[in-house]
Amino acid sequence: MLYIKSSNIGDIMKKILLILALMSSAFVAAQERPFQAFFGIKTENPLAVVSALDSFSNANCPGTSSVRLMQELFNGPEETTHTIIVTFPNKMSYLMWANNWTNCPAAGKFLNTMNEISEQTYQFMGMPLMGDGDPNADQVFQVFLMDVKDPASYAKAYSNLMSSGEQCAGSWALVAMGPGMNVERYGTHFAYCGFKDIDVYLDGYMSNVTPTKEYTDFIKKVSNIRELKAVNMSGVVKDWAPQQ
């Protein structure tokens, strides 16, 4: 994960808005393609974070993106306690969100509140490259952070692995990190596997004693082009969808 100790969520979210505005032209050819912004935070008051997101969502401005709050259940030595994921279904959704952000009083209130109750630990934009299943149906996720030297070859090998249908009980995806990524510490890509609930996750974890042939073949193919940085586990706290 991308760790920025001296920054807070208000300042960083303002900066990433500018970065994304400058980068938006890169999505002209793929304007119907979804992408996401990830904001990691450290907080001792998660209920206040939920309340702040409730208030912001109820204002429905700009109202063009969905928001998910994740709790980091196991993430090693990282200080991040939660991750805010903002999903844009297409480029126009983001442009409307960015253009309306400065005119939305609730946005300013949200940033001020978050400054008081949390500290931002990382931020980056992510572009899903492939995936399957409905992540909205999953509540627990295992996340693999990695540095990929040959993205095309890795994507092909990963697609073949996941198409076997035996590697993930729920949704899955491979995501390329964009603006904000820290390659040296956290790599260039992450993949996730979703589970309906913690019970399903534990069943899979406890029964995964012997790797499948497909997984063994996959490891052989990517051993020289992928460096695994970390394996984290996170759970959904709450989702907020745009109001119609």
Q: What residue ranges belong to the model's regions?
A:
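Short, Lys/Arg-enriched N-terminal segments with co-localized hydrophobic residues
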Residues: 1-12
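Intrinsically disordered, low-complexity segments
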Residues: 4-5, 22-23, 232
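Compositionally biased regions
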Residues: 7-8, 25-26, 224
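Intrinsically disordered, low-complexity segments enriched in glycine/proline and serine/threonine
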Residues: 8, 17-18, 94
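Sec-dependent N-terminal signal peptides
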Residues: 16-25
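Short S/T/G/P-rich N-terminal loop/turn motif that feeds into the first structured element of a domain
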Residues: 30-244
